[in-house]
C-alpha cells in the first residue's frame, strides 16, 4: 500500500529537518512519520530516519521500522483519548468548564498548564485548542472519583488507571496495532502506579509510552468516526510472473475493523471539533502552521517532558543521570470534514520545546500528499505503489 513517491518525499522532509535542527539540538537523532488512509487502514507512508555520526560526519540512516519497534511518551497528542474517556465514564460532559490555574497537592510541586499563570475558565474545546493540562488533570480526577482540594492529599486507586487504559487501548494505545509485519512492540505500561499523581501524568501523555504507529492508529480511529482499522502494508498478493507483466492476483487483502470504540458518535464529533480549533481557530497551538492550508486539516500538537532515552553519552550529565528533554509530537487528518489521510509525527529528545520541528514536518508531509494528489488528477505524476489516492 506504500505510495513510493509520497514515501520518498516524506523521507526527504525528515532528513532535511533532522540536519537543519541538529546543530542546535545535540540530543536530537531521530524522527518518525506515519501516514494512513483512515478509512481502510492502508499505510501510505511509514518513514523514520536516524542521525549517525561517523568520523565527525553526519550520516542519516533508515529507521522506518522504529515506527513500530520503539516507543516514547507522546504528550498532549493523546488528550483526545483523555476527554473521550471522561465523557464515556460520565466523569465529564461536553461543555463542562474547569478553572485552569496551577493545582497544588500536598508534598508535590504544583501541576500546571504550559501557560504557567493558567487559562482561566475554559471548556473542553478550549482545553484542546490551547492544550490545557489542568483540564486533563481535572478530568482524570473526576474519572478517579476524586475532588480537587488545594493543598490536599491525593487518594487515587489503581482502578482509575485500569479505566483509563481500558479506553486508551480501544484506540490502539498500549496494544498491538495488528500491522502485517513482525516485531511490533506495544510500548511500556508502567507498573509504579502507587503514586497517585502519576494518573495526572498519564492523562497528558507523560506516563505510558506508545509507538508512532500506535499514535497513527489512534488519530485514524478518531478521524473515521470510531473504527480502529488494522494497519496494512500489503494490499494484494499476486502470482509470480516469468515475463515482465504483473502476475494475476491470488488474494486481495480486505480492510479489517479491529474494534469500534465504545464511545458515542456525538462525543467523537466533539473531539473532532476541538481538533479543528487546534489547527484553524484563534490561538490554537497548530494555527501558525495549518490555518491557511487549503486542504482544511485538523489535529493536535504534543509536547512531553521526559528524559533522554538514547545511547549517546552526551545525553547524561556529570553524575551519569539522563538529561531532561522534550518529545515533540503531532497528529492530524485532512480534510477535517471528510478525512482521507491521517498522520502522526514523533520527534524525541529536544531541548527546545518550541522549535516547531513536529509541525514543520507535519505541514510538509501533508502538503506533499495533496500536491501529489493534484498532480495525479492532472496526469503530471505517476502513482507508484499500489495505493492510489482518491
Residue ranges, per PLM feature:
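Hydrophobic residues within well-ordered, non-membrane alpha-helices that form the packing/core
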Residues: 14, 18, 140, 275, ...
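Structural motif corresponding to the C-terminal cap of alpha-helices
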Residues: 13-22, 51, 147, 373
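Short beta-strands and strand-coil junctions in structured, solvent-facing domains, enriched
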Residues: 351-353
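Charged, solvent-exposed alpha-helical segments that act as regulatory interaction surfaces
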Residues: 23, 228, 284, 371, ...
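N-terminal leader/targeting segments and the immediately adjacent pre-domain N-terminus
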Residues: 1-20, 382-390
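Beta-lactam-recognizing serine transpeptidase/beta-lactamase-like catalytic domain environment
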Residues: 2-6, 25-74, 81-347, 388-390
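Short, gly/Ser/Thr-rich active-site loops of penicillin-recognizing serine hydrolases
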Residues: 244, 249-252, 256, 359-390
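Long, highly charged amphipathic alpha-helices
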Residues: 9-12, 163, 270, 360-368
Amino acid at each position: 500500500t506504500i505510495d513510493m513517491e509520497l514515501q520518498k518525499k516524506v523521507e526527504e522532509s525528515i532528513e532535511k529537518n533532522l540536519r537543519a535542527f541538529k546543530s542546535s539540538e545535540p540530543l536530537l537523532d531521530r524522527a518518525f512519520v506515519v501516514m494512513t488512509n483512515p478509512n481502510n487502514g492502508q499505510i501510505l507512508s511509514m518513514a523514520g530516519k536516524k542521525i549517525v555520526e561517523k568520523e565527525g560526519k553526519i550520516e542519516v540512516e533508515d529507521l522506518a521500522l522504529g515506527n513500530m519497534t520503539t516507543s516514547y511518551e507522546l504528550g498532549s497528542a493523546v488528550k483526545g483519548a483523555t476527554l473521550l474517556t471522561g465523557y464515556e465514564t460520565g466523569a465529564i460532559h461536553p461543555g463542562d468548564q474547569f478553572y485552569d490555574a496551577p493545582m497544588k497537592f500536598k508534598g508535590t510541586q504544583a501541576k500546571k498548564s504550559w501557560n504557567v499563570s493558567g487559562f482561566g475558565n475554559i471548556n473542553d474545546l478550549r482545553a484542546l485548542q490551547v492544550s490545557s493540562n489542568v483540564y486533563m488533570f481535572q478530568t482524570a480526577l473526576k474519572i478517579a472519583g476524586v475532588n480537587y482540594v488545594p493543598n490536599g492529599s491525593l487518594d487515587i486507586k489503581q482502578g482509575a488507571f485500569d479505566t483509563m487504559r481500558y479506553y486508551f487501548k480501544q484506540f490502539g494505545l498500549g496494544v498491538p496495532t495488528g500491522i502485517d509485519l513482525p516485531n511490533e512492540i506495544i510500548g511500556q505500561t508502567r507498573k509504579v502506579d502507587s503514586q497517585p499523581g502519576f494518573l495526572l501524568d498519564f492523562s497528558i501523555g507523560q506516563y505510558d509510552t506508545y509507538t508512532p504507529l500506535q499514535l497513527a492508529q489512534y488519530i485514524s480511529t478518531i478521524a473515521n468516526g470510531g473504527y480502529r482499522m488494522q494497519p496494512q502494508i500489503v494490499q494484494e498478493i499476486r502470482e509470480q510472473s516469468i515475463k515482465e507483466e504483473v502476475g494475476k492476483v491470488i488474494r486481495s487483502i480486505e480492510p479489517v475493523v479491529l474494534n469500534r470504540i465504545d464511545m458515542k458518535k456525538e462525543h467523537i464529533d466533539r473531539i473532532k471539533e476541538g481538533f479543528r480549533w487546534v489547527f484553524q481557530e484563534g490561538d490554537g497551538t497548530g494555527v501558525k502552521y495549518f490555518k491557511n492550508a487549503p486542504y482544511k486539516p485538523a489535529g493536535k500538537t504534543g509536547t512531553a517532558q521526559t528524559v533522554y532515552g538514547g545511547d549517546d553519552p552526551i545525553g547524561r550529565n556529570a553524575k551519569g543521570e539522563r538529561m531532561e528533554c522534550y518529545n515533540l509530537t503531532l497528529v492530524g487528518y485532512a480534510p477535517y470534514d471528510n478525512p482521507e489521510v491521517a498522520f502522526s509525527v514523533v520527534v524525541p529528545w529536544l531541548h527546545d520545546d518550541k522549535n516547531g520541528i513536529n509541525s514543520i514536518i507535519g505541514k510538509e508531509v501533508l502538503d506533499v500528499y495533496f500536491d501529489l494528489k493534484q498532480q495525479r488528477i492532472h496526469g503530471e505524476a505517476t502513482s507508484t505503489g499500489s495505493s492510489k489516492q482518491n
